[in-house]
Amino acid sequence: MEIPSRIQLTGKQFFVLTGIVGARAVIGLEDPFRGTLAEEMPVEVAKIEQELQEKGLIDTADNEPVLVQELLEYIEVCSRTLLTIHMRVSGSDEGQKECFIYYSSSLVVKADIESGPDGARAYVLEALGTPSEAWLKIIRHLQLEDRKNRDTAPLAMPKGWFQQWMSAEQGEQEPRKYLLAQGYPESVVSALADCVSDPERYATFTAYYCPDLNCRIQGIELLRVKHSNWLIRNEGEQDQIW
C-alpha cells in the first residue's frame, strides 16, 4: 500500500505510535487516554494498532508492531527532537490554523492540528525537507510582507497584556491609556490600537528547545496590517512591542 505524503492520525493513533518506538513525550501531543483505567489500556491499544494496520501504517505479522519506514522517520523526528516550534496563525479572511514543527539535523516534520470526523483533535504529519528548506516554508506561511519600518523605540506594557488585548480580555481602552500615560507618541499608540482591532494577520510563534527534557521556551507574536508589521516579545515582566 502506498503511503501518502500527508499522514493523518487521530490523537490515539499518534500516541500509540510514539509508544511503539519507545519515544519520550512529544510536545503538542495531548494524552488522549487520560481517564482510561490501566486494565483497559491493552484492549484500547490493540484496537488502535488494528486501525493502523488497516491503514497500512504498521505491520504486525510477527506479533510485534513495526512502523512503515516513512512513518517511522516522522515519529522519530517528532519524539526525539531538541527543537519544536508551535505556530498559531489567523487572518481576517480565514480561521485560525495551528501546527507543531519538529526539527532534526536532516529532516523537519510538521504536524497540522485539525478536527477529526468526530470533532476530536487530529494530527496531519508532513515532511518539510531539510532545516533550511523548512525555514523558508515557515516564513512564507507567516506571510510577513515588507512594511515600512517605524523610527521609534519599542513600546512596553505589563507582561501578558498584549495577548489579553488581542483576545479582548483587556478593556479596549485600557492598554491605550496605559501606553499614553507612559509618554509614548499618540500617533504610534493609535496605529498599534488600530492594528489590534483589525489585523490582516496575527501569529504566535513559540520555540521549545528541550535537551534532556529541560525545556527553554522563547515566544514572539507577529501582527501584520496594511502599512506595518509589529513584533511582540516577553522581556522579563514586560511585553516589548516593536
Regions found by a protein language model. Give the residues of each.
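A short-motif feature that recognizes glycine-rich, charge-decorated loops
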Residues: 55, 64-73, 164-205
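Short, amphipathic alpha-helical interface elements at domain boundaries
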Residues: 1-53, 57-76
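A general structural signal for short secondary-structure junctions and capping/turn motifs
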Residues: 6-7, 99-102, 222-223
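Extended, charged low-complexity segments
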Residues: 197-242
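Surface-exposed beta-loop interaction hotspot
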Residues: 113-182
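Residues that form generic nucleotide/phosphate-binding pockets
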Residues: 20, 74, 137-141, 195
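Accessory beta->alpha helical hairpin/"wing" motif in late/C-terminal subdomains of nucleic-acid enzymes
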Residues: 45, 55, 59-108, 112-135
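Exposed alpha-helical structural elements
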Residues: 12-16, 47, 70, 133-137, ...
